[in-house]
Amino acid sequence: MQRGREREAESQRVRESERQRGREAERQRERQRGREAERQRGRERGREAEREAERQRGRERQRGRGEAERQRGRERGREVERHRRGREAERQRGREREAERQRGREAEREAERQRERQRERQRGREAERQRGREAERQRGREAEKQRGERQRGREVEAEAEGRGRGMRQEAEATEQGQGQRQRQR
């Protein structure tokens, strides 16, 4: 009976020990699973972090490309603006050259008008001198004619005077002749 109890107690201890080992092994497995799960989660987090970093790099690259594209766009814009300003400056220079030519033509026309007025005045003065000379000649002819007329008048007068003297002398001679004849008679 005593041995039966001991065997029972032994059996009890064995079972207890077995259960204890089982529980220990279970806890061990549990811890193992926990560690494994933790490692899994760590790996997962690592992969997620890697993916996030890749996405970040992708976004960075995208932004970089976008920025580079914008930079190129700005550069093209500036280039277009330079060309536009160049063309505008060229047109402006063309307009200035045209205005310069216009001013030149205008100045030439003005100079021509000036020369024409000068020639006109010259012709006027020439005509005036011509008229003066003509009037002078006319006055000369007129004076000449008047002198001629006065000369002829004097000649006629002298002639008349001469005839008058001749007739008086003749009359006197006649009177004297008659007187002598009367005295002789």
Swiss-Prot record:
Residues 2-158 are annotated as: 15 X 8 AA tandem repeats of [QR]-R-[GVE]-R-[EQ]-[RSAV]-[EGQ]-[RAK]. The lineage of its organism: Eukaryota, Metazoa, Chordata, Craniata, Vertebrata. The keyword Metal-binding does not apply. This is Octapeptide-repeat protein T2. Sequence repeats lie at residues 2-9, 12-19, 20-27, 32-39, 40-47, 56-63, 71-78, 84-91, 92-99, 102-109, 114-121, 122-129, 130-137, 138-145, 151-158. It comes from the Eukaryota. GO terms for cellular component: cytoplasm. Keywords: Repeat. Residues 174-185 have a biased composition (Low complexity). Residues 1-171 have a biased composition (Basic and acidic residues). Residues 1-185 are annotated as: Disordered. The gene is Srst.
